[in-house]
Amino acid sequence: MVKYLHSMIRVADPAATVAFFELIGLKEVRRFDSEQGRFTLIFLAAPGQEGLAEVELTYNWPPEDGSPAEDYTGGRNFGHLAYRVENIYETCAALAAAGHIIHRPPRDGHMAFVKSPDGISVELLQDGYLEPAEPWASMANTGSW
């Protein structure tokens, strides 16, 4: 039997990334700091999905010698994470109010794309049907998603 566990993304700023996913509705379910390995693992899940479908945020600590931390770019080559949300318009409004660009607005009331602080593409899908509504219906795409 195969069971999905999680998707892992590397992050440069754990606090900013956790705050981003909290705006979507995920919650931190556990955290592990490895002094020996010099990394932190943070697991997030939608309410009721703990242990079923999680996102693992991996933060590799800066080198002890003071050299620059690894720069994680090119998040688009990961593909994307997808979440069903209760109200796509409210979720996108909360993300936009927090300074996140809605790269593919929910013009159809069904689907939107945003990026995490680390450039990971996140697809938002409406749970159920919503009529197309302004200002979203007439917004153009911004950048890649």
Predicted segments — roles?
Residues 39-40, 63-70, 132-133:
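A short, acidic/glycine-rich surface segment
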Residues 2, 8-52:
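Core segments of cupin and vicinal oxygen chelate
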Residues 66, 79-80, 100:
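A contiguous binding-surface segment within folded domains or other stable secondary-structure elements
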Residues 31-33, 40-43, 83, 89-145:
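Vicinal oxygen chelate
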Residues 70-71, 78:
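Short secondary-structure subsegments characteristic of cysteine-rich extracellular domains
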Residues 49-50, 61-64, 130:
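Active-site/binding-pocket entry motifs
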Residues 4-6, 76-80:
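Eukaryotic phosphotyrosine signaling hubs
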